[in-house]
Structures are given as C-alpha cells and as structure tokens.
A protein has these predicted regions:
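Tandem repeat scaffolds
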Residues: 3-234
Length: 234
C-alpha cells in the first residue's frame, strides 16, 4: 500500500523517477526525485511525499504545499514557494534552514548551500558534506563523527562543542572557523586544509588520545594531518 491506495505493480514507478508532468491524483510519492530547475506551475502538492527531493532552482510559487513531507529535500536561493509557506522550518535543507537537532545522519548533502542555516545540536554523523557551503553556520553541539567535509567552505563556521571524531576535513577552507571548544577531534583528518594557521598550535595541544588516533579511511592520524599544514619555518 502507498498511502491508502492499493499498489498496482503494472503502473508503479520508482519514486525517484517521477517527473512533475506525471503527477495526477492523490498520494503523490516523489521521494528522491530530481526536480531541480523545474517550473511546477500550479500543481497540487498537498500531503505529497517529497522527502529527499532536489528542489534547487525549482519554481513552486503557485503550488499548494500544505502538509507536504519535505524532510531532507534540497533547496537553494533560487527555489521559490508560495507566499506564506514556511520553507525554512519544513525540514528541507538549504540556505537559512532551521535544522536545530535535526536527524541528518548519513545524509547526502554534497555541494549543498547551508549559509545562514542553523544546525545547533544536529545529528550529522556519517553525513556527506563534501563541497558544501557552511560559511558562518553554527554547528555548536552537533554530532559530526565520521562526517565527510572534503573541500567544504567552512569560513567562520562555529563548531562550538561539536564532536568531530574521524571527520574528514581534507581540503576544507577553515578560515576563521571556531574549533577551540570542540568536544573531540579524535581521528579527524585536516590534510590540505586552508585557513588553520593560527589554530594549529592550539589543536596540537589536545590530548594524545585524540591526536594519535588512526583514521582507517585516510590512513593517518590527526597529529600527522595537522603537522603537515605547518610551514617549514614553524
């Protein structure tokens, strides 16, 4: 059963393959569909399942979205919705989203724009944030263990008391990022990061248990990755 409608295997299509022009009737299931850059006209999307749908650049300004499940749907500054619809508190992920305490474990957030978003206490363990825009974002108290932030833009990102065990920061831009109060960096890899010059010494004063923990993915320790960032004269 999908919703309250019997499942007809002859006409069934995978949710992620559903295109806007195929929508008809009730119980719309478009989980994981790519609707980026689409103009959805005046579609009735009330109570639709749009979880994980890519809505970046999507025109939803004439669509009815009341009751739609938008958890983990991706949007950007070009996404438009009907006046009065609160996209930022809908569970969707994008710039300005209110995601305090959100469960985003293992989520695919590659290249997502989260500037202006609030993610305090968010559960991001194992999430892939490669190439994400996290400039100025507050991640205080977040669980970022095993998270992938390769090449992410983390300028002035506030990591507060977050957990960074085995996080992969390789190639990330950490200019002015606040890392002084993080709970742990055990096994985290900072190889090829930029912007950490003024914090390297402070981070290398953390416990040996954190600094010498082996990261089986990047095949190195936190200490080695931080020391590799030091200029020859340091």
């Amino acid at each position: 059963m999908v919703g309250s409608v019997p499942l007809n295997l002859r006409t069934w299509a995978a949710p992620e393959s559903v295109h806007p022009e195929q929508i008809n009737g009730k119980c719309i299931d478009a989980r994981g569909a790519n609707w980026s850059e689409q103009d959805l006209g005046s579609q009735d999307l009330r109570n639709a399942n749009l979880c994980r749908c890519d809505l970046r650049g999507c025109n939803l300004s004439r669509c009815q979205l009341e009751g739609a499940d938008l958890r983990l749907a991706r949007f950007d500054s070009a996404t438009t919705v009907q006046e009065g619809f609160d996209l930022f508190n809908s569970g969707a992920v994008g710039p300005g989203a209110k995601l305090n305490g959100a469960f985003l474990n293992n989520a695919d957030l590659r290249g997502i724009d989260l500037r202006g978003a609030v993610l305090m206490g968010a559960y991001l363990s194992g999430a892939d944030l490669s190439g994400a825009l996290l400039d100025g974002v507050s991640l205080a108290g977040s669980d970022l263990r095993f998270a992938i932030l390769r090449g992410a833009m983390c300028r002035a990102t506030r990591f507060g008391t977050s957990q960074l065990d085995l996080a992969d920061f390789r190639g990330a831009d950490l200019q002015d990022a606040a890392l002084d109060n993080v709970e742990s960096i055990k096994g985290a890899d900072f190889s090829h990061c930029s912007g950490l010059n003024e914090q390297i010494t402070h981070l290398l004063n953390r416990s040996a248990m954190e600094l010498d923990h082996w990261n089986p993915l990047t095949r190195g320790t936190t200490r080695t990755s931080l020391e590799s960032l030091r200029s020859p004269q340091s």
